[in-house]
Amino acid sequence: MMPGNRQPMTNHHNPPSHAATGGPGPTPGRSATLAPRVVIVHRRTEREQIVRERGTWAQAKFQAGPGVVAKKALDSIDSRHTATESALQVVSAAIPGGWRRGAVEREDLDRFLFEPEDVVVAVGQDGLLANVAKYLEGQPVIGIDPDPGSGLGVLARHRPEDCARLLETTADGRAPTQQRTMVEAVVDGPGSGLGLIALNEIYLGSPSHQSARYLLTLADGRTETQSSSGVLAGSGTGATGWLLSVARERRSTLKLPAPTDRSLGWFVREAWPSPTTGADLTEGRVDENQSLTIQARSESLVLFGDGMEADRIALAWGQTVVIAPARRTLQLVI
């Protein structure tokens, strides 16, 4: 997605999925007559990216030089590429003959049209599932780790050889799923059409090392003008990443949400107390039907989700952002 492109906010307000917790059930939108379509989502491997930049793999190896460290790094890149290619072949072969199929690279997700009957298979690390989640509306997602053990496996928790079984049980509604809560930010009210959605977390702050100045309003009505390094609000999925890192760094006692909890955790980073700014309201929870409201009090603030700074929204003085648990959830096959 090019900077400045935004997802239509109308897509962010779908009826809530059933609260979830790991039990099987019918797949939303599944047609009784139309064969399911399996959409394989993947990203360009590091080797493919290097070849794209250097021309050939041999040229990349030549430019890296003869050193042992360089050779080990390239061997590791080559090994991961081979594992990914193998996993994609296994997943493709697992799709039943009568089913439809599609494939999309991560960089093309914003131009790909998912259908209600789709079963999405993401072949890659956890971050790939976070990337695809914001484009889905209840379609089940199977996370395949092409190189088991190389990542955390929080979302991409299945092996390639499990795909055939998972496709069958997912299509007929027998596969257990988790409805993972997502985070939504709406700018200047629902009617503006401006906002974003993320699986892990949403960040609001300055695009540089300067402080961000804003008015923070909590769900209970308390307010505080702050100058800080930014505000971070995340889901239970995000509570295993950046949100957890912030909590540990500040030795917070805040109980972070679980992945299926309909609530968010939030932190203010490095709030600066001064005669005109406070540092008392720096962490908390946002439960279902609640929100965290932030009004920009400085120019050139940015808003982005899941670390995707290229998809950031630029905020001007006076613009208001409302952050809350999204109605949409990620239906993760577990």
Where are these regions (language model features)?
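Short, basic, low-complexity termini and linkers enriched in Ser/Thr/Gly/Pro
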Residues: 3, 7-13
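N-terminal, charge-rich interaction modules
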Residues: 11, 15-18, 22-50
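Catalytic phosphate-donor-binding core of small-molecule kinases
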Residues: 28-44, 61, 71-74, 78-107, ...
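Short glycine-rich anion-binding loops that position phosphate/pyrophosphate groups of nucleotides
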Residues: 45-46, 125-128, 147, 236-240
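Structural motif
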Residues: 118-119
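Redox-cofactor binding/interface segments in oxidoreductases and associated redox assembly factors
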Residues: 122-123, 233
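Short Gly/Thr/Asp-enriched flexible loops that form oxyanion-binding sites at enzyme active sites
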Residues: 128-137, 243-248
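Short, acidic/small-residue loops that bind anionic groups at enzyme active sites
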Residues: 135-157
